[in-house]
Amino acid sequence: MATAMDHPQGKDFTDLATLQLAYDRLLHQAQHQAAFLGTASHELRSPINQIISLHQLILEDLCEDPAEEREFIAQANQTIQTVLKNLDLLITLSKLDIGTLQPQPQPILLAPLLTRVQRLVQMQCVNRHCRFSLGPVEPSLSVQTDTAWLEQVLVMRIEAALAQGSPQISLTVADDAAASDVVIHLGANPGEAPDSAVAALSPEFRYQLATRLLLHVGATLERLGTAASPNSHLGLRLPRPASQELLPRNR
C-alpha cells in the first residue's frame, strides 16, 4: 500500500493525473452540452417566431381576404405541429442521455428494417425529386441494436440529406463475414437546399441529433466524405449479435 513517503508531500500523482483527466473530460462534455442546448434553442425559436409573425398579420387585419387569413392560420398550425414534434424528440433524447429511458438492444434482421426505412422516406424523396436506392441485403444478416432507434437515426439522416437538396441518396450494406461488425453506408450527392414554407430543423442539427442517438444504438459513425462535404458519405458500424439463434421479429 502506498504511503506518504512514496510520494512527495504525500500526494499520489497518478491519482491526481487521473482526476485531472476525468475533470477535463467532464468539462469538455459540459461545454459540448451547452453548445448543443444553444443550438437546440435557436432551432426551436425560429419556427416559434414564424408562428408569431403569422398571428401578427392576422391580428392586425393585414390579410387581403378571408382565404388568405385561413391560409396563414393553416401555416401557423402546421408550424406548431412541427415544433411539438421537435420538442418530443429533444425530450426523448434527454431521457436517453440521463438514463430514464433505456434502449433495448437485441439481435435483429437488418433487411426488414432497411426496407421499412425505405418505405418511410420514399414519398419524401419523390416529392423532393430525389432518387433513393437501397442496395441488396442478405436476408439472414443480423446486427445487435435497438430497432426503433436505429430506424430513427437512418430516417433522420436521410431527411437531413433531403433538406440539403440531395438529388440522389443510396443506402447499402458492407457485410464481411470475417468481421465482427456490419457497416451501413449512406451516400448522398450534394445538392442545393430548397426553400421550405414550414420551418423545420436545419440539416446540420438533424445530423447532430442523429449522431447523439447513435451512442444509444451501439453504433459508431464513420465520416467517409470529402472535407468540403463530410456528411456526403457516412458509415454506421454495428456489432453482430453474440448468437445468431432465436432472432426476434423486427418491430
Q: For each predicted feature, which ranges?
A:
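Conserved glycine-/histidine-rich ATP-lid loop and adjacent helix of the Bergerat-fold HATPase_c
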Residues: 206-222
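Short alpha-helical segment of the dimerization/phosphotransfer core of two-component systems
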Residues: 78-83
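Glycine-rich/acidic phosphate-handling loop/turn and adjacent ATP-lid/helix
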Residues: 179-208
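Conserved signal-transmission helix
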Residues: 1-32
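Primarily the dimerization/phosphotransfer
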Residues: 24-57
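Short acidic helix/loop segment immediately C-terminal to the autophosphorylated histidine
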Residues: 58-67
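Conserved catalytic submotifs in the C-terminal HATPase_c
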Residues: 106-107, 131-141, 176, 189
